[in-house]
Amino acid sequence: MKIWEDEKQVYIRASMERNTPEQNAALKERLEQIDWSILEHIQRKETVNERGVFAPLEAVEVPEIEARRDEFKAAGLDAIRAGKVGAVLLAGGQGTRLGLDRPKGTLNIGVNRELYLFEQLFRNLMDVTDEAGAYVPMYIMTSNINHKDTVTFFEEHHYFGYPKDYVKFFIQEMVLACDHEGRVYMESDTEVAMSPNGNGGWFGSMVSAGLLDDIHARGLEWINVFAVDNCLQRIADPLFIGATIVSGCESGAKVVRKAAPDEKVGVLCTEDGKPSIAEYYEMTQEMATARKENGDLLYGFGVILNYLFSEKKLEQIADARMPIHVVEKKIPHIDLEGNMVKPEQPNGYKFETLVLDMVHMMDDCIPYEVVREREFAPIKNLHGVDSLDTARELLKGCGVTL
């Protein structure tokens, strides 16, 4: 049975009743390209949250990093100079919570001058490439919502001085969105309501965009993936890359020491013997407060969404089905009469994969400690915690002129 023949799919059927035959022919063609099996995850949404046995994972802490600085840095710079390292910037979001109706990376974080979030990230990268004397290919993941604006922004600002040949854009894959009964919403009478497939879909989206050929042509062996909102992070950090290579691990994760046992941050640990991330709400009180003999928290390091993955391993797991997280969200759509609805409360489900599940598909992962005040300044709000205000103060503390 075709999806539009299913009497349950009232939104699709209502739109088809209003459409012309030509519009319906085009709509049917699009409907046949959509993966409808994703709806089955509504029934299984609780099972994805069933977890195994957690155990602590020892981090490479700052004192050890300082003691082995020359060793780690040499290994990392060698990899960069040999053209083995690429970077992926996850930048599919809009700056809605920051009062922007445009890509989040276009936010001006300056005070007395213009300094854009994208610009600061590229400055961080160029600190490394200037030292290495070699460029790192940067792949920027956008979304259907912000792709054109993002590309235009980079062109207008001449890629902030980075060579254009080393910057490539790709669009994150989209999946359908539905109500709580699994009835697929329509964005308009001719378009299904779709949403990005979560930050775990970045490598699959690169493959779909045909970028695997580019990765192979460049000879990349390591991919550093990171999120747009942390303006302080070091990208393609030679020390981090070197520590991961020297450890023999196939992945690494930058982590910060937790500020408090109950801090709302995912913790890098092991789950059934493999690296994993335990979300703060999955940790028991006993886990959250357990301490080592020296008084440090046993589960004491939180991830900051800056990972290094073996490219070879990424290809090996590319065809594996990642867990689908069914997330309640507010989904704009047209109702059965064709009127636009912008809900104020969650009215259905979106389906997402998460990069933290990618970590669990690795055989090993090295938790690499960075100093919070030097490398973690996320901008999620205009004011308050993790805001533009707090990020500006941290940037100033690191010597950035605003």
Language model segments and positions:
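N-terminal glycine-rich phosphate-binding loop and ensuing alpha1 helix
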Residues: 2-168, 176, 187-203, 212, ...
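Short secondary-structure boundary micro-motifs
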Residues: 71-73, 80, 91-93, 207-208, ...
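Hydrophobic/aromatic beta-strand patches that form the interior of the parallel beta-sheet core
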Residues: 88, 107, 139, 168-170, ...
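Short hydrophobic/aromatic-rich motifs at helix boundaries and adjacent loops
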Residues: 94, 183, 285-286
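Generic domain-boundary/flexible-linker signal
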Residues: 98-99, 149, 180, 234, ...
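Conserved beta-loop-beta/alpha segment of the NTase-like Rossmann-fold superfamily
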Residues: 160, 164-263
